[in-house]
């Protein structure tokens, strides 16, 4: 399994779309999936989409990686933004799928320069809006 993980390729589109999210703010979120031996972009969220739109886009029974650009207001009333990396690994997904996603996560995350907060979730309650907000502050 480790050998397969170290050979996991990251499609250039993943890095390009992440740069667009980070610098141009073209997207609110990006959902990635492992397709064979590479990570590919599955869905791009428009800038006006909400956190609820994002969570609704994650499959209930399959693992995914995701990046979410979270806008918030600090206690000092300052507008801020943090980029979250979310490793979605629902309990109901297949064991092999969970292993592949877990073993490839760090390598994939290293390709995305600018991640500020990482979150691992096996259940929607582990990535609720309140949890995201508390991790951002």
Swiss-Prot record:
* UniProt cross-references to InterPro entries, sorted A to Z: ADF-H, ADF-H/Gelsolin-like_dom_sf, ADF/Cofilin
GO molecular function terms listed in the Swiss-Prot or TrEMBL record = actin binding
Pfam families to which the protein is assigned, alphabetical: Cofilin_ADF
Q: Member of which family?
A: Belongs to the actin-binding proteins ADF family.
Q: Could you tell me which species this protein originates from? A: Arabidopsis thaliana
PANTHER family of this UniProt entry?
COFILIN-RELATED
One GO cellular component assignment for this chain's record is:
cytoplasm
Record has Transmembrane as a keyword: no
Q: Which parts of the sequence belong to the ADF-H domain?
A: 7-137
Tissues with expression: Specifically expressed in pollen.
Question: Which UniProt keywords are present, listed alphabetically?
Answer: Actin-binding, Cytoplasm, Cytoskeleton, Phosphoprotein
> Gene3D superfamilies from the xrefs?
Severin
What's the protein called, per UniProt? Actin-depolymerizing factor 7
Q: One GO BP annotation here?
A: actin filament depolymerization
> In the record, which positions carry Phosphoserine?
6
Tell where it localizes.
Cytoplasm, Cytoskeleton
Q: Which domain of life is it from?
A: Eukaryota
Gene deleted: what happens?
Answer: Decreased actin filament severing frequency. Increased amount of filamentous actin and inhibition of pollen tube growth.
Function description: Actin-depolymerizing protein. Severs actin filaments (F-actin) and binds to actin monomers. Binds monomeric actin (G-actin) with a marked preference for the ADP-loaded form and inhibits the rate of nucleotide exchange on G-actin. Required for pollen tube growth. Promotes turnover of longitudinal actin cables by severing actin filaments in pollen tubes.
